Structure formats: C-alpha cells, structure tokens
Amino acid sequence: MFLMEGLRNAEDVQNQEISDIVCLVQSGRAENGSVQHIFERGENLHWLFCEVEEPLMRLISGTENGQGIILLVKQPYVMDYPQLLNGLHGKYVLLDTVQDPGNVGAIIRTAAAAGCSGVLLTKGSADPYSEKVVRSSMGSILRLPIYHDLDI
C-alpha cells in the first residue's frame, strides 16, 4: 500500500476506475462540494471512507497544509525480472541508482507524458512508492508500470 494525498489525486484514481481504496477524509471537510463528488464516485468503485480528526490527519499527512483527503492505494502487481525480460516491448526509462525522490517522481511523470511503456529502477534507487516520489509524479505513478529493485 502507498499513500496519495489531495483532491486531484483522488480524481485521477477515480478516472482510472481503481477500486477498493481506503479514503481518509479530515473531519469538517466532507461538506466541501469537491469532496462530495469524490464520495459519490468512490461509492461506485467500492471505496471505504473513514472520517479522521485533524490531529491524526496531520500525523498521517506528509504535507504541511494538506487538503484533508488521503488515499491508501494498493501497489499494482509487477512482473519479476525474468518475466519482465520475456515481455519487454516498447520504450522504457531505466533509472540506475537514482536516489533523489523528487527526480524519480519527475522522471516517472515525464515518461508517462512521453508515452513510455514503463519505468525500470535498479536497486539503490529511491522507493517509487515513497511519499515524495508519489507527490512529484503528480498521479503519473498510476499511469504506467513501475519495475523497481531490479538487479541488472
């Protein structure tokens, strides 16, 4: 599981029709029209909504002034390296021990925009599902397969 924060990410996840999400909503934010829209669409996708008090939300959130909505998203299944080599078609971006999470997220975002088939990360690279990578990918982490911890 990994965390995604904010209304835009919630909308991106819903637009991709990803189901079975746990959505934490800060108390008092549910009245917001945008959050109501997330509730309506999320119910159709079997999302579980939990209201969370502000102190707990601050503890969970990685941002100083969050929007009061956090998603717990299941990491997609990714083939292991031998399977990957047999089925590797298209254009891929290879990151060899890129450790800066902001750079990894930006490269994932660029790879998605360029129409790449996936991103490969070798051992020693930043965790693609860390808070900073997910945030800097701006939702692109959901748009293409990410193969990580590869020993090439």
PLM region descriptions:
Residues 1-66:
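N-terminal positively charged helical leader segments and presequences
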Residues 8, 15, 30, 44, ...:
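RNA substrate-binding interface of SAM-dependent RNA methyltransferases
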